[in-house]
Amino acid sequence: MSFNNTGKVWSVDAFAQYLKTIKPPAWAKAVCLHHTSSPTLNQRPNGFLAQHLENLKDYYSRQLGWHGAPHLFIDEDQAWGMNPLTETGVHASSFNRLAIGIEVLGDYDNEEPTKGRGLQCWQTATAITKLLLDWLSLPVNDKTVLFHRDDPKTTKTCPGGKVGKAWVINLIKNSSVPKTEPVSVSFSALVPELEKKGYSSEEIKKGLKISNGKVYWRDKWLEKAYYDKYTQTTFASTEEINLIEQNQ
């Protein structure tokens, strides 16, 4: 157990590619879902930032004396790493040795998981869960999708009283899992590449849009592009960048 993935962050597409670079662990037989409870959605209006994960790491390691942590933290559009996926973590007493632990941003005893930002967080979490179960060659059912409250050693409602198992399983089964490109696909920071093509800062501001996690250039969807909140950088594949032509 360790905190070696702290500082890593992935979009759903990037996470799919990342999983292709590591070997599924034999111990993992399920995914266990949690909610952060605190912080709430209101306390993190812009989702997680890198410093938030560093603070959590410090809390787990120094204040609680843990040698590991949950594996992933999910906000509206990204997965933030902490415990390596190949190592058992610390998140639910009965499930630590058999499940990958995921913390979903929000307090779903009081906040709403079926609309707004809450729904966005759960859509991202269930897409990530589907990728993990596929990676582990596991089916989607109530034995592979665990809630913290399923642990007989806890009295918590986690991942929140408003979150139902059947609803989550349905989201997982119907999640839009990306068709992953080979790991060798090359990505570059989009803005510097547009500047090299001769676009001015003003043209880039007008032409580059990000909506619902999708990146658009002059209303054209760049399917492989994504915005990384950790570095505050938009990345696009070299292929897509090369197809961009400056309109005279």
Feature annotation, model-predicted:
Residues 1-36, 43, 76-79, 84-88, ...:
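Basic/polar, cationic surfaces and motifs that engage anionic cell-wall
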Residues 172, 176-178, 229-248:
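Repeat-associated, polar segments at repeat-unit boundaries in modular proteins
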Residues 65-68, 74-77, 81, 215-221, ...:
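Short, intrinsically disordered low-complexity segments
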Residues 207-235:
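Acidic, low-complexity, intrinsically disordered interaction modules
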Residues 200-208:
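Short, well-structured beta-strand/strand-turn elements
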Residues 181-199:
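Disulfide-bonded cysteine-rich modules in secreted/extracellular proteins
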Residues 18, 171, 190-193, 207, ...:
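Charge-rich, solvent-exposed alpha-helical interaction surfaces
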Residues 47-61, 65-68, 73, 83, ...:
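Glycan-recognition patch characteristic of GH18 chitinases/ENGases
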